[in-house]
Amino acid sequence: MSSQLISLVNTDRIIGKHVFGNLYDIDPKILNDKDFLHNLVLEAVKIANMKLVEIKSWNFGGKKGGVSVIALVEESHIALHTWTEYNYATLDVYTCGENSNPQAAFEYIVSQLKPKRYQMFYADRSSE
């Protein structure tokens, strides 16, 4: 699913580009590796040509377990949340930067997590 979603919309008035999705059947060891996921999101920031402001990551316990990683970038954010019990993750990449590429960040993270299947969506977050 590597279609160029962003190219399907009129880019003259785009204020925000939002690529998000669900990733299924991922190795649970990866989904609980906070350091790996933290570094993965850091690299995605670079690949998408975004400017990092701050990044936070944390494990959460309980029955479902998992990790959350949030990168605050000048252009907006990248958020990755995992659930080890379900071998599942959600990924949200939003940018209002003209030169940043949220789809590149999304596809890079997917390539490293290697889900058996995933869904990718695009939302044009423009003013009109």
UniProtKB/Swiss-Prot annotation:
The keyword Transferase does not apply. Disulfide bonds: none annotated. It catalyses: L-arginine + H(+) = agmatine + CO2. Its cofactor is pyruvate. Binds 1 pyruvoyl group covalently per subunit. The modification Pyruvic acid (Ser) is found at S76. Pathway: Amine and polyamine biosynthesis; agmatine biosynthesis; agmatine from L-arginine: step 1/1. Its EC number is 4.1.1.19. Is synthesized initially as an inactive proenzyme. Formation of the active enzyme involves a self-maturation process in which the active site pyruvoyl group is generated from an internal serine residue via an autocatalytic post-translational modification. Two non-identical subunits are generated from the proenzyme in this reaction, and the pyruvate is formed at the N-terminus of the alpha chain, which is derived from the carboxyl end of the proenzyme. The active site is at S76 (schiff-base intermediate with substrate), H81 (proton acceptor), C96 (proton donor). Keywords: Autocatalytic cleavage, Decarboxylase, Lyase, Polyamine biosynthesis, Pyruvate, Schiff base, Zymogen. One of its GO terms (molecular function) is arginine decarboxylase activity. Specifically catalyzes the decarboxylation of L-arginine to agmatine. Has no S-adenosylmethionine decarboxylase (AdoMetDC) activity. This is Arginine decarboxylase proenzyme. It comes from Sulfurisphaera tokodaii (strain DSM 16993 / JCM 10545 / NBRC 100140 / 7).
